[in-house]
């Protein structure tokens, strides 16, 4: 949670209110850990970044034109420690999602990001993700999300 506490003020300073006091919370990360879907990047003994690499697809993903019954690997809760931003941590975590997809026998990778998150909107296309559409999520009212997909 220390990483979230460092990242959230930076997100808010850029107008990105995707994360806040209520999300993500310790219970969310505890569930990720229990399901063996939380990935941690470590540099010099410090947590450099985290992501949840899952098969969880929100029902609203269908609004982006996706068949949510297809097996896909989905990245959620991607965060990079400010001390390690610009060092390829997010790229490495996204590449880990590709490894998980290959092991799971799927070639579909998906991710969504807040419409105000300019950093990830720049990152995902550089990694081969294609913009698929804009959605809203019932669990995050008042926010808009951009969906991206990559086929291996």
For each predicted feature, which ranges?
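A short helix-loop-beta-strand connector motif used in the catalytic cores of GNAT acetyltransferases and
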Residues: 28-40, 56-57, 74
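Conserved beta-hairpin
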Residues: 37-51
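Conserved acyl-donor/pantetheine-binding loop and adjacent beta-alpha core of acyl/acetyltransferases
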Residues: 52-77, 85, 139
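Conserved active-site alpha-helix within GNAT-family acetyltransferase domains
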Residues: 91, 103, 116-133
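Conserved catalytic-core motifs of GNAT/GCN5-like acyltransferases
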Residues: 112-113, 125-145
């Amino acid at each position: 949670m220390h990483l979230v506490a460092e990242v959230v003020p930076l997100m808010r300073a850029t107008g990105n209110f995707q994360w806040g006091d209520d999300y993500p919370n310790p219970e969310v990360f505890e569930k990720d850990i229990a399901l063996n879907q939380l990935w941690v990047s470590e540099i010099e003994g410090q947590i450099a970044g985290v992501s949840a690499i899952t098969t969880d697809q929100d029902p609203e993903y269908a609004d982006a034109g996706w068949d949510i019954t297809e097996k896909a690997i989905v990245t959620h809760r991607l965060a990079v420690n400010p001390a390690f931003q610009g060092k390829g941590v997010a790229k490495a975590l996204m590449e880990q999602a590709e490894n998980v997809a290959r092991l799971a026998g799927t070639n579909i990778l998906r991710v969504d990001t807040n419409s105000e998150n300019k950093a990830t909107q720049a990152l995902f296309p550089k990694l081969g993700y294609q913009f698929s559409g804009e959605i809203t999520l019932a669990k995050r009212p008042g926010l808009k999300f951009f969906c991206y997909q990559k086929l291996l």
